[in-house]
């Protein structure tokens, strides 16, 4: 039961932060940059914590709270998919392609960057 509570509190916090960040960061050049930003931030955190957990003994509960709850709610694959599809539907093929490319390569890069930053501590 404790695990569900931790995931729920983390999820609530991540969802609220996603709402705030997406509201603050406007669409730039027709690309939904708020969604991109939350996905990049979440990917960095996951990369950092997953690598750190190999060396620090970060508890399973803490990882549930941060990675499953907080980052799971902060990041949003469904919104990214919807926004990319919406751009395609409006015949903004290049903008949709840029959105897809920047989200996928950016998030993978942020996982790597988070891991590299973490490795500098351990």
Curated annotation (Swiss-Prot):
Gene Ontology biological process terms from the UniProt entry: cellular detoxification of fluoride
Recorded catalytic activity of this chain's protein: fluoride(in) = fluoride(out)
Chain positions recorded as Na(+) binding sites: 72, 75
Record GO cellular component, one term: plasma membrane
Summary of activators and inhibitors of this protein: Na(+) is not transported, but it plays an essential structural role and its presence is essential for fluoride channel function.
Domain of life of the native organism: Archaea
Gene Ontology MF terms in the entry: fluoride channel activity; metal ion binding
Keyword Phosphoprotein: no
Membrane topology: Multi-pass membrane protein
Ranges that cross the membrane: 5-25, 29-49, 65-85, 93-113
Entry keywords, A to Z: Cell membrane, Ion channel, Ion transport, Membrane, Metal-binding, Sodium, Transmembrane, Transmembrane helix, Transport
Zinc among keywords: no
Compartmental location: Cell membrane
HAMAP family for the chain: FluC
Alphabetized PANTHER family for the sequence: FLUORIDE EXPORT PROTEIN 1-RELATED (PTHR28259:SF1)
Function, in words: Fluoride-specific ion channel. Important for reducing fluoride concentration in the cell, thus reducing its toxicity.
Sequence similarity: Belongs to the fluoride channel Fluc/FEX (TC 1.A.43) family.
Protein name: Fluoride-specific ion channel FluC
Natural source organism: Methanococcus vannielii (strain ATCC 35089 / DSM 1224 / JCM 13029 / OCM 148 / SB)
